[in-house]
Amino acid sequence: MTSLDQFVTAVIASPSQYTELDRIYVHNRVLGLVGEGDPIAASDDQLTSLTDALVKTAIQNGKIEATQSDEDILADQLMDLVTPLPSVLNQRFWDKYQVSPQTATDYFFNLSKANDYIKTRAIAKNVVFPAKTPFGDLEITINLSKPEKDPKAIAAARNQPQDGYPLCQLCMQNEGYLGRLGYPARSNHRIIRLTLGGNTWGFQYSPYAYFNEHSIFLDQEHRPMVINRQTFTNLLEIVQQFPHYFVGSNADLPIVGGSMLSHEHYQGGRHEFPMMKAPIARTIDLGIAGVKAGIVKWPMSTIRLTSQDLVALTDAAVKIHETWKNYSDESVDVRAYTDGTRHHTTTPIARKVGDDYVLDIVLRDNQTSAEFPDGIFHPHQDVQHIKKENIGLIEVMGRAILPARLKTELAEVGKYLLDQPNQMVAMHQAWAAQLKATNTITADNVTTVIDTAVGNVFARVLADAGVFKWDDAGEAAFDRFVAAMHD
């Protein structure tokens, strides 16, 4: 049996709409995509391996160019054949939801892996390790899964006509979109429709997941990120619908927000982040009945709210957010506005613990200064050799997403520490010299020394992003902010 025949059999056995009667039709659909020359054999009978073989066959037959863009587009067209139509998938999802929310998400998650929408093979390349810090074990990841952009492809994409469709990579217009040079293939992409606050939203998984069951909840309308009462209501509504998932929103301002501020969306999933394990350092009273509140022992300034009353919980979140938006304290460089520009917002995260709903509200400030041009509450220059990008939702919760360059760069730091010939980049010199001076380095412990040091740098990164520091001045300033909520 050829790889093409095996693939057709897999399509018929898949959750798609095809049956044995459709075999000839599906065979001809695949032939049309890959060409009529002899199919290249697959390395095994896994669906992804069969797809790889058919993509190579298409290159051999001159149907596509041997470029990442062409290969991705064809692979996703093939995987579309094993994927139910959006209407069918949505019906099945909500049918399974009647059994339990987890039954529904398990079905959708497994399907999104099986059809290679979630790039499990690429994600497996990521480097992940824990790091002990004064704030508990942080999670360090070096992100190797997202493909590097080919300079030639970037140049070619610049010459492509831009018709603004899809409007952005989070729009529902991406569902089933073929893709093009410089824009990802989405033929096998599916979105579950749900209602939040009376509006239609979508639920999908992230193709390059940063944690288990990494989900995206997106507004059907293309409108900018905003944090307000509706945000808190929506987050709690999602946790009501999917109590086994947490969900949070990136902040709605540059520097402290995520990389996609143009389309309202949230991220969630099934993972207990370090911040969720962090204890309450001291309780506070917000004057809202039925809501417990406390300052979390965490490098970023966080107030944890707990209640079974969703309206009271939302009221408490709004009180913190609205007070913070207009709150300044010059003694600790906290300024709500400069020259009419707003600097304050929050990063909210919701989850359910037993019968309680929990909202963590993280205070954010995106000011810049002559001393800190990238951001006063952003990784400072001396830690930017490890992390200089924005501190978004996932990192706020204690999971570092570090750039791919670090895999090779840290290997060279290791050689330097062992006095071996190396090509260590200059920006790591001061840090590496300090590691050398303060540790007895051996071949057996060099990796542990570096991993621990990277973890400590990430803890410092989070501390830089925290508006109220864990010193006497910072804690007194935090208490003044809490008092301001009673004014």
From Swiss-Prot:
Keywords: Carbohydrate metabolism, Cytoplasm, Galactose metabolism, Nucleotidyltransferase, Transferase. It comes from the Bacteria. This is Galactose-1-phosphate uridylyltransferase. Its EC number is 2.7.7.12. It catalyses: alpha-D-galactose 1-phosphate + UDP-alpha-D-glucose = alpha-D-glucose 1-phosphate + UDP-alpha-D-galactose. Its main location: cytoplasm. GO terms for biological process: galactose metabolic process.
